[in-house]
Amino acid sequence: MNLAHLFSAIDDNFVSIWKGSARRKALCSEPWLAETQRSLDTVALSLSEITETTRIDISVSREWLHILAWQMGVSNGLVCDKGQTGTGRLDYPIEVARRTVDIAERANPLALDSHGIGMEQKLSDIAGCLADVLHVSSGDTSDTFLHGRQYLHLMLTKLSMMRGKESRYLRPLVAKAGGILDSQVPRGMPALPAPAGFEGKIEEIDGNGRVDRRLQWAV
């Protein structure tokens, strides 16, 4: 099992839609999107007999491709209400982020870091998509979106220490997240670095034991 097997799930339609083909509206249908997402999971099922380093690469790449496919669906009008089922629903990136966080948190840091800037970019793309969804759904206080904010915080925290230093993708993501990170996060989460132009402060608050820190941007 290697990345070539994973990318075998990517067909010509995927490439054409990704490149912005004039036929993308016709190619990007709900059945195609569902089958593409299913194929990515099916191809990546046999991960037990490989090294951890390879498994991490394949697993994160799979989630990254899930996000790319979902974004193609969004750009072609295939997003449905979050309450519905299917990989085209609005909150699907939260599910992808949950799996990505699980992969990254369980990984040996050296194995994760060994994939270099490519790994950072994939994590950044997933986190950026998650931030977009959370902005669109900023008024939603359901557990799903609360968890989404927690996953975003965890992904940004991971990017703050990749390869022993802050990733180049971190501060643009923190700036993009904006007020999302003012919302409740679990006790004990570390504070994130402020974005460029930050003039506020990071302070601890006590939200009935549920909140530890929040970012405050100057207005």
Annotated model-derived regions:
Residues 4:
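Aromatic (Trp/Tyr) and acidic
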Residues 9-23, 36-57, 70, 77-219:
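Fungal C-terminal regulatory tails
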